[in-house]
Amino acid sequence: MDADIFQNLRLELRRGCLILAVLAHLKTEQYGYTLRKALADLGLAIDESTLYPLLRRLESQGLLVSEWREQDKRNKRFYRLSRDGAETLQQLEAEWQGLNASMNRIL
């Protein structure tokens, strides 16, 4: 298989997983750096150039809320799930469980 084809398919597969992982991890409020580090520590590394546009998009869709706060003498933007985000996360978690079970049977 062509390496470019594999890379494109791999990125497509990861995209949906990243959305679910970010939403799940923002059940508790975090700022971008701590979110990125936590996901990496759990085995899901994500580039800043991917994370921050994703956070902005999820916020514009009403799934996240954010606010600027000073911490350690620096301004940081903290993110958390909105009410709609929490409902969407529940739906996506259920969808993930079904897909995961199906894929485990298929593979």
What kind of feature is each model-predicted range?
Residues 1-11:
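Short, Lys/Arg-enriched N-terminal segment that forms or immediately precedes the first helix
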Residues 52-57:
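Short, hydrophobic-biased segments on the C-terminal half of alpha helices
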Residues 61-74, 80:
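Beta-hairpin "wing" of winged helix-turn-helix
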Residues 10-50:
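N-terminal helix-turn-helix DNA-binding core of bacterial DNA-binding proteins
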